[in-house]
Structure formats: structure tokens, C-alpha cells
Amino acid sequence: MSILDTIVEQKKREVAMLPARVIAAGDLRDAMLERGERRDFIAALCQPGSRSAAVPAAGSGGVPPRETSPTGTAGKPAGGTPAPHPPIALIAEVKKASPSAGVICKDFDPVRIAREYEAAGASCLSVLTDEKFFQGSLDYLRQIRAAVRLPLLRKDFIIDERQILEAIEWGADAILLIVAILSDEQLKKFHSLATEAGLAALVEVHDEAELERAMKISPLLIGVNNRNLKTFKVDLVTTERLAARLKSRAGFQPALDRQDARPTLLVAESGIHTRTDVERLKQCGAKAVLVGESLMRGGDIGTKVRELIG
């Protein structure tokens, strides 16, 4: 049994202890309305460097805005010259430990770390909520939300719709959906429930087969995990290979069955340690990078963030 299988089995035991109930889209929308604020995760990725703004709770999960210059002309600054290549967005991870690395940060203060990430220019935050394997907590979402203005991703192993409700109630603006642990039916259902409620969904893949499954639901966010969750081997070529596959099949253009002009955004995850790594991933089409361990081990978080994204 792989570590991923072990984690999922533990997650099934945890989910079995949650109050039994059927979760409908209306329940999630009501929970979001009761919370009263949604931070636009996807818009924040489309505007790296800008400050997050709250939007009405009844939103649609984030609509990437049209990129404009100070003159208001998309893609061109004053004078009509081409705009420079847009900066890459950083999803900075609040992460104490992992099965592969053990304890990463002994002096772990989630609020302090989140504030340092925000001050250094992160676009969004990823918050580990798995307790047994990553020493995370749902309460970290609540604490961090009260301390910063950035949109928050609940980083966990979602296998049940009740976990989506938890994400809303504890303060997340986005959830992670790992294709490797979900059936096609679950993936479609959870993605639909989340987006209808106003949560962004980062749909994570690791290989071509998972990418093809993911693209059937026309996600706004595709995360490519460079770490094989079964072997824990890391290789940035994974993002390059799947980015090429995305370009060949869709060219990052809107899916034909989606009734709007929103493209799929590529997020590269894991194994990202240097500015060279970031530039390499940016060149192959990544709009954002999700980085945790190298930032948590970097000593001065602010300095490390600036080294990565400039």
C-alpha cells in the first residue's frame, strides 16, 4: 500500500465520524452566505502583486479578469508597445510537516508565517488541514483568515462533500481536488458543488491519464503536482510534459462546452526551490506556482519569497 493509499484510508475513517447528512449545492451556498465574505482565489492568481479584495459571497468561484494596462488597453501599456511578460503568481503554503520530509518547521506559528507571506507578495495561501500526516488543522484556516486578506486554499484530501462544507465554514476560498483519489463521478460532483457555492477548485493531476480525466469537467484551475504521491519522487519535467499536452489539446483556450471566455490556468506544484525553477515553469505556461517546503526551510520567509518571484 502506498502512502497515498494509507492517507486516503485514514481520511475515510475521519469522514465516517462526521455528522451524517446529504450535502446539496444549496447547503453550501447558504454556508457561504452565512460566512458573508468570499475572497476571489482565481482573480488573485490573475493579478499577482495586487492586494486581495473581498467580493460578495454569492460569487461563482472566481472569474479571471481581463488583463489591462494603466491605460485600460488589454495587454498594452501607454504608447501601444507590447506589455512585459506578466509575473507569475505565488500560492505560498503554510506547512508544518509532511510524510516525506517529517517536521519541516519546528518553530511553527501559522499566523506569523501567513503574515510574512502576505507582506512578501504572495497572491494566495495554501493551508494544510490534515492532522495525522501533515500536522495541520482546520483551525489554522480560521486563525489565518482573521490575520490576512489573501484568499485561502484548504489543502487536504477531499473525498466527501461534507469536507467541502467544512472548508467554507472554517474560512477557505478554494479546495484541492486530487484526481488520483476520486472517481470521475466524484470529481464532477465535488467540482460542481464547490464552484456553485463560490469556492474555487484546484484540480490536481500528475500524469496524462489524470489530465484527460480532469479536462472533462472544464476546470478553471489545473494543478500539476511534480511529486508522485505514490513514490514521492519529484521531477519538474512533469509540469513541462503536461503543459505541452494541454497546449496540444486545448492551447489554454476555453473548453468548447463552457459558456464563457475563461481559460484554464496552470498551477505548478512541488519541487520548486529556486528562481530558475520558477522561470522554467513559467516558460512552459504555468500561471502560478504552489510552494511550501522550500519557503518554510528558507529561514527568512520574506527574502525567500522575493528570491523566488522577484
Where are the regions a protein language model picked out?
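An N-cap/entry alpha-helix motif that binds or orients negatively charged groups
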Residues: 2-48, 86-105
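Conserved, mostly hydrophobic/aromatic
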Residues: 7, 92, 117, 167, ...
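Intrinsic disorder/low-complexity segments
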Residues: 46-87, 247-264
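Active-site mouth loops of central-metabolism enzymes
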Residues: 94-109, 151-159, 202-204, 267-268
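Catalytic beta/alpha-barrel core
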Residues: 125-134, 151-160, 173-184, 199-207, ...
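Glycine-rich phosphate-binding active-site loops on the catalytic face of alpha/beta enzymes
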Residues: 166-182, 224-231, 286-304
